[in-house]
UniProtKB/Swiss-Prot annotation:
<keyword id="KW-0597">Phosphoprotein</keyword>
<dbReference type="GO" id="GO:0045109">
    <property type="term" value="P:intermediate filament organization"/>
</dbReference>
<dbReference type="GO" id="GO:0008544">
    <property type="term" value="P:epidermis development"/>
</dbReference>
<comment type="similarity">
    <text>Belongs to the S100-fused protein family.</text>
</comment>
<protein>
    <recommendedName>
        <fullName>Filaggrin</fullName>
    </recommendedName>
</protein>
<keyword id="KW-0217">Developmental protein</keyword>
<feature type="compositionally biased region" description="Basic and acidic residues">
    <location>
        <begin position="163"/>
        <end position="176"/>
    </location>
</feature>
<dbReference type="GO" id="GO:0036457">
    <property type="term" value="C:keratohyalin granule"/>
</dbReference>
<comment type="function">
    <text>Aggregates keratin intermediate filaments and promotes disulfide-bond formation among the intermediate filaments during terminal differentiation of mammalian epidermis.</text>
</comment>
<dbReference type="GO" id="GO:1990254">
    <property type="term" value="F:keratin filament binding"/>
</dbReference>
<dbReference type="GO" id="GO:0030280">
    <property type="term" value="F:structural constituent of skin epidermis"/>
</dbReference>
<dbReference type="GO" id="GO:0061436">
    <property type="term" value="P:establishment of skin barrier"/>
</dbReference>
<feature type="compositionally biased region" description="Low complexity">
    <location>
        <begin position="16"/>
        <end position="26"/>
    </location>
</feature>
<feature type="compositionally biased region" description="Basic and acidic residues">
    <location>
        <begin position="184"/>
        <end position="195"/>
    </location>
</feature>
<dbReference type="GO" id="GO:0001533">
    <property type="term" value="C:cornified envelope"/>
</dbReference>
<feature type="region of interest" description="Disordered">
    <location>
        <begin position="1"/>
        <end position="313"/>
    </location>
</feature>
<feature type="compositionally biased region" description="Low complexity">
    <location>
        <begin position="285"/>
        <end position="311"/>
    </location>
</feature>
Amino acid sequence: PDGSGRSSNRRDRPRQLSPSQSSDSQVHSGVQVEGRRGHSSSANRRAGSSSGSGVQGASAGGLAADASRRSGARQGQASAQGRAGSQGQAQGRVSSSADRQGRRGVSESRASDSEGHSDFSEGQAVGAHRQSGAGQRHEQRSSRGQHGSGYYYEQEHSEEESDSQHQHGHQHEQQRGHQHQHQHQHEHEQPESGHRQQQSSGRGHQGAHQEQGRDSARPRGSNQGHSSSRHQADSPRVSARSGSGGRGQSPDASGRSSNRRDRPRQPSPSQSSDSQVHSGVQVEAQRGQSSSANRRAGSSSGSGVQGAAASGQGGYESIFTAKHLDFNQSHSYYYY
């Protein structure tokens, strides 16, 4: 409740900032809101915003990127505070208020029709991802519920990876083309890594199951990962907020992931609002990627699908995913 309350405040604050900062960010956040509406997973929205701002950034160029960066920076700042996690979910929650504002942002995006329409087209294309991601999300949520503690471990990874993703967010765009290749590699490698992770640990099994599910879900993995991360991130966040004590399974894991979450995101925003654009997306991705594999593959592939739209986000992450998968294969899955 505190987390959600704070996230409500945070969500209100950043959004207030968003419209005040830019109707463009609102355009994209409006798209993201549309994504949120469509996604109900802020992660997908963010992925939507990422692919929106990725493709929109392709269309709107720096504008969507700037808006995403702004929102990403805001989110990334909040996420640096770990608020983005709450905020992302808060955004998920606020997606309604975000929808309101986002509708304003949508109207704004409509005001910027080219952007707005590209936003909508992206949001729609993302919406397809969202929808597929939503189905996958539900599947993965069920798997999540099954995997329970896997969330936390995965979230740790997600945090870590989201960190790498923040860092790599810059490179996502560069390697968007790579993403698909890597993404496929992930999918191939990741089941392997999933098995390896299974070998590595029961977490691995969980991660593996989720990841394998992710493999299928991976194109939607971002969506799944995001929604799962949301739930997972919600749990770890709450646990992080609650001291992750209730998460006795991995209070350290969730706490560390919270700390990591906070730490890397702080560097990420400091690194770049671009990484925040991606990290904002990736924050969403992180949230979504509570499974690092999902994040990596999820944001990679989900963003990969959306990142196929975003062209980028997951690309480097996909490389990372491959690398991580190699690490996972090395059983350094918890190499963080």
